[in-house]
A protein has these predicted regions:
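Formylglycine-dependent sulfatase
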Residues: 1-195
């Protein structure tokens, strides 16, 4: 869901220091293809196929194996935390657990409240009780659950951990301290960023 220009390392105006450090010490892409929608991009990423092959009828093409299915068959532990948005809510056969992930925390829907996300699941079970806890924020919950999955993973088995944040996606719900940090930044409009 994040665009290339959203990251500080590619010229974005929002501070992304941790991602910038990863980019500084890792591999940065300079030639890439992006689809105009988050769902088809996600389907292509998880199947390694062109989006018109990977995504059919609001779900991953059943004839395409996901990265999780392939890696699980090769002996990897497979975990996911975050936004799925590759199936309709009633199509459980297309949910993360059914598409190769052994453990999952996140939303089936693509966009929802960051404070009370619709379709929140832990594996295939409803997890809406999670956001009844004071201070719940979906972005933090995605990170916390991913960290917990990594911490309890077997050290002698390779791990595929897929994390899909909703934070750069509509609706844009930020914590008050994050809003305050950028107060006035866009008071003159977006055109000042293009200058």
């Amino acid at each position: 869901d994040m665009g290339l220009s959203d990251l500080g390392c590619y010229g974005g105006e929002i501070a992304t220091p941790n991602l910038d450090r990863l980019a500084q010490n890792g591999l940065r892409f300079t030639r890439l293809y992006n689809n105009n929608m988050c769902t088809v991009t996600r389907a292509a990423l998880l199947t390694g196929t062109y989006h018109t092959i990977a995504f059919r009828n609001q779900a991953i093409n059943p004839r395409c194996a996901t990265l999780a299915e392939t890696l699980h068959a090769a002996g990897y532990a497979t975990r996911m935390s975050g936004k799925w948005h590759l199936a309709n809510i009633g199509e459980r056969n297309q949910w993360p657990i059914q598409r190769g992930f052994e453990e999952y925390y996140g939303t089936i829907y693509g966009a929802s409240s960051f404070f009370a996300p619709a379709s929140l699941k832990r594996n295939n079970a409803d997890a809406s009780k999670d956001f009844e806890k004071p201070g719940y924020y979906y972005t933090d919950a995605i990170s916390d659950n991913a960290a917990a999955m990594i911490a309890k993973a077997h050290k002698d088995k390779p791990l595929f951990m897929y994390v899909a944040y909703t934070s750069p996606h509509w609706p844009l719900h930020a914590l008050e301290e994050d809003v305050a940090k950028y107060k006035g930044k866009y008071a003159k409009g977006w055109d000042t960023l293009r200058a």
